Amino acid sequence: MKTAVFSSHQFEINSITKANNNKHELVFIEQSLSAQTIDLAKNCKAICIFVNDTVDATILKKLLVHNIKCIALRSAGFNHVDIINAKKLGFKVARVPEYSPYSVAEHAVMLMLALNRKIVHAHNRINELNFSLNGLGGFDMHGKTVGIIGTGKIGQQIAKILYGFGCKIIAFDQIENETLKKQCNVSYVDLKSIFAQADILTLHMPLSQETKHIINKKNIHLMKTGVMLINTSRGGLIDTKAVIDGIKSEKIGYFGMDVYEDEGGLFFEDHSQTVLQDDVFARLMSFQNVLITSHQAFLTETALQNIATTTIHNLNCFEQNIQSGNEIENLKN
């Protein structure tokens, strides 16, 4: 089946090509999917999209013009797709529900440790032959209270890792995980309590109308002074301007993020020769206690292999008109 693979990146093409094994005719397109690039999918039977490719009502109509009714997502999240209209119009949409919870969990813990022990600053000093330790002090993770908001597959791995550090773990989720309670001594609390008690807060939940900007001015006010905030989940969970105000007031002592609400057109691209136009992001970059990575928490060989394998499986099922088990129905993101 001829498939247009939008937002294709060098780091993933080999994995996808290997998993495909010449089964489908894949057209790798570097550009992201948009009203201006959709015609590049002409004569294709399916499109394959990445996390920042938006499929809204306009794109759906244009896909119908090209007789394309199959959409394969190279991601677990699907808030960038108008699922309700897609289903009404008869589109088949499938995602990669799980690729490697370990990769994202490990990255989140890496952000915690790097912020705490000021690893980036220490490295930069060494490069300048400055071996002073002044200002590089951190704290013991052991004994700290970590609040995990969302205990799905990634949140569970976070709990297991940090339990090994000797952290006290509290969590918030609509569904309490009984195994985590027993294995990691996790205590489930309400949102107000997790904000008030946590020394470190880490987000691991989907983006929906209910969770959008769950980190906002009101909830930041409830947090401990000097709290560490980590987001490797969805950029839209955070009101970035409120976080900036929280950092300026020193309510937020550390901020680590791998996702950004307005990352489309910014992340996954080389802008080193251009002027940054996003003033909010530029302000974040100016803080010494902020550590940013560009949506790379998933980026391990294992995850890339799993994403590629599942994506090709979904395309196979589209072509054979059978269920893959990864279809997206009219669900909340």
Protein language model annotation of sequence segments:
Residues 51-52, 199, 205-207, 233-234, ...:
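Short glycine-/small-residue-rich Rossmann-like dinucleotide-binding loops
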Residues 134-225:
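Rossmann-like dinucleotide/phosphate-binding beta-alpha-beta segment
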Residues 1-94, 216:
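An N-terminal-biased, well-structured beta-alpha scaffold segment characteristic
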